[in-house]
Design a protein with these regions (language model features):
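Conserved, structured C-terminal
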Residues: 1-150
Length: 150
């Protein structure tokens, strides 16, 4: 079970109930590639998505890695605070240690006081057990054989 969770995180796949839920919309979760407004097909939620598609997202799901990673140090799970300039700007949704890439991986929502480029080029910290660890946002999954990225 844990091996499959690690592989899905390495590949950029999200988990329903952790990384995506009714609290987030498809644009915040990086799933806009799965939506097409070109076809004249009505689907559940289409009207709402059309209303918000051009609005600025309030938060963005990102993949982060920790510097100086070791297995289980720290033990990333979910709901750890994400900091930028000593302010909480988000929370993690999933976490694991990737033995294939020798890194701690975490998914997390970062509140959008910043543009996507600013988020991708900024340094963050993730707090685990009252200790902060430097984190870097990945532009694509570690196992980037995927057809999409967050």
């Amino acid at each position: 079970m844990h091996a499959m969770d690690i592989m899905r995180m390495e590949s950029g796949f999200v988990h329903w109930g952790h990384d995506i839920s009714p609290e987030e919309n498809q644009f915040e979760a990086g799933l806009s590639f799965a939506i097409s407004f070109k076809k004249n097909i009505n689907f559940i939620g289409r009207d709402t998505l059309e209303k918000i598609k051009d609005k600025k997202v309030e938060k963005s799901l990102k993949i982060l890695t920790l510097e100086n990673s070791k297995p289980g140090e720290p033990l990333l799970l979910h709901d750890e605070p994400i900091y930028h300039n000593n302010k909480i700007v988000g929370r993690t949704t999933s976490g694991c240690f990737s033995f294939n890439f020798n890194k701690n991986i975490s998914y997390g929502y970062i509140n959008s006081g910043m543009t996507s480029d600013q988020i991708d080029n900024s340094n963050f910290e993730i707090e685990v057990e009252k200790k902060k660890y430097r984190a870097t946002v990945l532009k694509k999954p570690l196992n980037s054989k995927n057809i999409f990225t967050l």
